[in-house]
Amino acid sequence: MARIGESADLLKCSFCGKSQKQVQQLIAGPGVYICDECVELCNEIIEERLAEASEETTGEFDLPKPKEIFGFLDEYVIGQEAAKRALSVAVYNHYKRVRAVSTIGPAKTVGDEIEIAKSNILLIGPTGCGKTYLAQTLAKRLNVPFAVADATALTEAGYVGEDVENILLKLIQAADYDVKRAETGIIYIDEVDKIARKAENPSITRDVSGEGVQQALLKILEGTVASVPPQGGRKHPHQEFIQVDTTNVLFIVAGAFAGLEDIISQRAGKKGIGFGAPLHRKDLNADVFGEVLPEDLHKFGLIPEFIGRLPVVTTVTQLDQRALMEILTKPRNALVRQYQRMFELDGVELEFEQGALESIADLAVLRQTGARGLRAILEEVLGPIMFDIPSDDEVGRVVITRESVVQNAAPTIVPRASMLRAEKSA
């Protein structure tokens, strides 16, 4: 490129048409010319486009307030008020931090340069109580990429199993390989209690699926630029990698932590003196998980560095019969509504008597499967009738009774003709 000086021919900008005498500079290219004013205008357009793209990929979205997030969770998740409240605040603060980072700089406020640390979440509670569903619903409300990983499949680098970087690959896939969007997503790591250290004291033998995995997770939990193999599997030196910055990825790690309640109860029942002495209580609360302290998690088998990267700790409680009844009918996508919709697609109404719903909830409590077991029970009850209904055009309504659940009795069938006669007489 060359600057055009004075010449016999009067040259013009190929974009705005101004002559070389009307502008300060005219830059020549192969058969075209551009003036300094058009260059400046192009720079402004490029900056605006880049800023718009940055807003879309770095968290500049309509961030709902904690009460709005809580209200949305309330529409889908029954009970677990404390967990919903804690998650609403934690998620709001996380994405508020992401927004600050994208507009101000690397996690610093203007002037005082206060660094805003990331707050990942540890979710503790029995199986079937809605831990995974809470995280899925959060991601749905925020419209961010969401990935679920199983901690039991992970092993330390160099051993048979999955590397921790494969977790990030799932998030990238959930974002349709939009890395920038994935970098503000949510990763839910389940069964994290299964990677607890096998013994309270460090062992001289290698614990590749326990403490080793905790060590491997530290960096991505805290925030690092990880090299992710695009096809998954083990890394090898002759492959290309996707670079993913986990600084703004929210990690929600969860587990049932069976046996943790005994550790908490043992600590709460001890006597001592000084600042570390527990308060004496005559009896423990039913929700003993709500009393968990970092020292209990350490005794369970989580290393201190891992605990330190999960500053927000919240718990979910065992669901009782009343809560399970509400889960069947109240949420926007309640199980009963889902099955009623499936029957509607065959032109059949599905009705549940109150006694049937109570019996389904009682069975789930008895089996200790929580909300996850409700669908299995409904499949057992409705399976035979769902086999027959598509082939029988005479059926207009199916009524599930208590006997249908408890004694495997056939449901009450209302013929379509009877329903039509009742409608005409009405």
UniProtKB/Swiss-Prot annotation:
Q: Which InterPro entries match?
A: AAA+_ATPase (IPR003593), ATP-dep_Clp_protease_ClpX (IPR050052), ATPase_AAA_core (IPR003959), Clp_ATPase_C (IPR019489), Clp_protease_ATP-bd_su_ClpX (IPR004487), ClpX_bact (IPR046425), P-loop_NTPase (IPR027417), Znf_CppX_C4 (IPR010603)
The protein, known as: ATP-dependent Clp protease ATP-binding subunit ClpX
Tell me which residues bind ATP: 126-133
The UniProt entry's sequence similarity note says: Belongs to the ClpX chaperone family.
HAMAP family hit by this protein: ClpX
GO CC list:
HslUV protease complex
Give the PROSITE patterns listed for this entry. Answer: CLPX_ZB
Molecular function GO labels? ATP binding; ATP hydrolysis activity; ATP-dependent protein folding chaperone; protein dimerization activity; unfolded protein binding; zinc ion binding
Q: What does the subunit section of this Swiss-Prot or TrEMBL entry state?
A: Component of the ClpX-ClpP complex. Forms a hexameric ring that, in the presence of ATP, binds to fourteen ClpP subunits assembled into a disk-like structure with a central cavity, resembling the structure of eukaryotic proteasomes.
Q: Name one GO biological process term.
A: cell division
- Where do the TM regions start and end? none
The species this protein belongs to is Clavibacter sepedonicus (Clavibacter michiganensis subsp. sepedonicus)
User: What SMART domains does the record tag this protein with?
Assistant: AAA, ClpB_D2-small, zf-C4_ClpX
Sorted alphabetically, the keyword list is:
ATP-binding, Chaperone, Metal-binding, Nucleotide-binding, Zinc
| PANTHER family for the chain | ATP-DEPENDENT CLP PROTEASE ATP-BINDING SUBUNIT CLPX-LIKE, MITOCHONDRIAL (PTHR48102:SF7), ATP-DEPENDENT CLP PROTEASE ATP-BINDING SUBUNIT CLPX-LIKE, MITOCHONDRIAL-RELATED (PTHR48102)
Q: Which Pfam families match?
A: AAA_2 (PF07724), ClpB_D2-small (PF10431), zf-C4_ClpX (PF06689)
Keyword Zinc assigned to the entry: answer is yes
**What role does this protein play?**
ATP-dependent specificity component of the Clp protease. It directs the protease to specific substrates. Can perform chaperone functions in the absence of ClpP.
In this protein, which residues make up the domain named ClpX-type ZB?
1-54
Tell me which residues bind Zn(2+): 13, 16, 35, 38
